[in-house]
């Protein structure tokens, strides 16, 4: 299978590894990017593999409470300048109002606002996309927005200040699950197998590797779960420990960040300026 430049670029963006290393890894896996990442982690060639899902688009995250739930909406545009534009934000808030009224699906939101969107694109001169909407249920909800780029809503049993602080923690620390035991078994097994292989590649006997992996797996599930993470307000304690001290709990959370997973075209600024200068001379 011929390896394309696009595949090499994607792997390079996701791992931070060199171009030739990426091409070699893809060749060895017959173009399987996920397997290539695993193999590069084993060999130590992809120390930045966690870069997957970096922000690659502009726009805004908005939040509004409904009856017993909250709606989180992402609307995208092409530049940070337009993301702050009053017309763009008014459009995004109009979509949010409808979403928060009755948990409207993203497909229905897109259809309902398509004409308005097209008119705004013509007016502003940038592509605009109503990308996604998420809903979280709960009688006790707290929200936090970091500017308009990150939005978090946390559901749980706690006082307002505690839940707000937890929402701020989620914004900063990006947990994927509420508790370590919520991490899916297949993800745990995949990581465990990977860690055993890494340990054995370091020259450790199988029985020693197994024991080492127990600690590594506890760290792995803790780092990607909210209650297992070190609390940003009190780094010596986990979020779970702090919640327990307060007699509080978190049942769910949603975190959205502008542009997650969107491939953004890389601009050559120098070439762009040169082209503009050439155009003025023409």
Swiss-Prot record:
GO MF, any single term: translation elongation factor activity
Family classification: Belongs to the EF-Ts family.
Protein location: Cytoplasm
The UniProt record lists the keyword ATP-binding: no
Role of this protein: Associates with the EF-Tu.GDP complex and induces the exchange of GDP to GTP. It remains bound to the aminoacyl-tRNA.EF-Tu.GTP complex up to the GTP hydrolysis stage on the ribosome.
Pfam families cross-referenced by the UniProt entry: EF_TS (PF00889)
Database matches in InterPro entries: EF-Ts_dimer_sf (IPR036402), Transl_elong_EFTs/EF1B (IPR001816), Transl_elong_EFTs/EF1B_dimer (IPR014039), Transl_elong_Ts_CS (IPR018101), UBA-like_sf (IPR009060)
Record field: transmembrane: none
GO CC, alphabetical: cytoplasm
UniProt main location, coarse: cytoplasm
Name of the protein: Elongation factor Ts
Keywords: Cytoplasm, Elongation factor, Protein biosynthesis
Highest taxon above the source species: Bacteria
